[in-house]
């Protein structure tokens, strides 16, 4: 059984202290990739110098290419376009892989042509360590139904390996989205292929001070937009999935409205909560949030009158 070749795409931006460890974890794979493509998306510093000691001992080509400077999604697209492998694996510059990761995932792709994307479980930690794994991959993958992908993004991007064909047919990451580009991509892939997860912590998601905190309001807005695009593009199809997506959009508006309310942005909060109720009326949290908006406005008006 011929194993498919793997190209690794690693976007990076000004994390020269963390990048060498990520590259080293790729080089330590028991099944080495065909190539590693590092997309420098505007680092303040010399990427080549930071990883030179690792490159000198690698047994496969490591290439640094310039990125467009517009975030990880566009940078990943540069890597996908340049990749030569049958499979494309993604890893972020602040995450790590266990040595068995690519070997286990690649063996599943070779055995099952219906698979388009295979992720792994991820260990979230501030202190990376090498997990004690059995010598053989699990006997079964955990399939990810499309309904689970509509509810939320269950995949850490650094855990994902996908067939090259997925991008040839579905296109690349949607660069017009500010956030959640990966989730929108997985939804498109899941329309045509099976999605699964190796039930073992083969990816290490590092928690560290440099991680950029996201505005919760912006995150909720992007969640709703991803699902809207899925409905419009047909990546979310069928009556049950479409109904589920509409409920999830309503729930995203509800959470966004409540986050705005906590931030004191009452007018915007009321707009979001009304939108949530218009999409799905049976949302007690949206109704109670709307009542709080009105009470807040009433209290402010009474205070102004006094």
Question: PLM ranges: what are they?
Answer:
Residues 1-221:
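Nucleotide-sugar donor-binding/catalytic module of glycosyltransferases
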Residues 3, 207-306:
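C-terminal subregions of glycosyltransferases and related glycan-biosynthesis enzymes
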């Amino acid at each position: 059984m011929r194993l498919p070749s793997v190209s690794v795409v690693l976007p990076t931006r000004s994390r020269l202290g963390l990048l060498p460890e990520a590259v080293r974890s790729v080089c330590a794979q028991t099944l080495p990739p065909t190539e590693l493509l590092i997309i420098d998306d505007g680092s303040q510093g010399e990427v080549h110098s930071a990883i030179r000691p690792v490159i000198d001992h690698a047994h496969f080509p490591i290439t640094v290419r310039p990125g467009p400077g517009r975030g990880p999604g566009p940078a990943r697209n540069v890597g996908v376009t340049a990749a030569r492998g049958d499979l494309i694996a993604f890893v972020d510059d602040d995450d790590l892989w266990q040595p068995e990761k690519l070997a286990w995932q690649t063996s599943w792709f070779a055995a099952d042509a219906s698979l388009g994307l295979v992720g792994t479980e991820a260990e979230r930690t501030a202190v990376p360590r090498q997990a004690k794994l059995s010598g053989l991959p699990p006997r079964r993958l955990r399939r990810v139904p499309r309904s689970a992908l509509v509810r939320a993004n269950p995949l850490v991007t650094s855990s994902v390996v996908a067939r090259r064909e997925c991008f040839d047919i579905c296109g690349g990451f949607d660069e017009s989205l500010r956030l959640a580009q990966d989730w929108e991509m997985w939804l498109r892939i899941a329309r045509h292929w099976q999605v699964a997860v190796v039930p073992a912590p083969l990816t290490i998601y590092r928690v560290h001070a440099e991680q950029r905190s996201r505005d919760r309001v912006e995150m909720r807005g992007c969640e709703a937009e991803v699902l809207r695009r899925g409905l419009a593009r047909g990546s979310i199809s069928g009556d049950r999935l479409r109904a589920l997506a509409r409920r999830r959009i309503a729930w995203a508006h509800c959470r966004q409205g409540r986050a705005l309310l906590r931030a004191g942005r009452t007018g915007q909060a009321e707009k979001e909560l009304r939108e949530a109720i218009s999409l799905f009326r049976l949302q007690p949290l949206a109704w109670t949030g709307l009542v709080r908006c009105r009470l807040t406005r009433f209290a402010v008006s009474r205070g102004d009158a006094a």
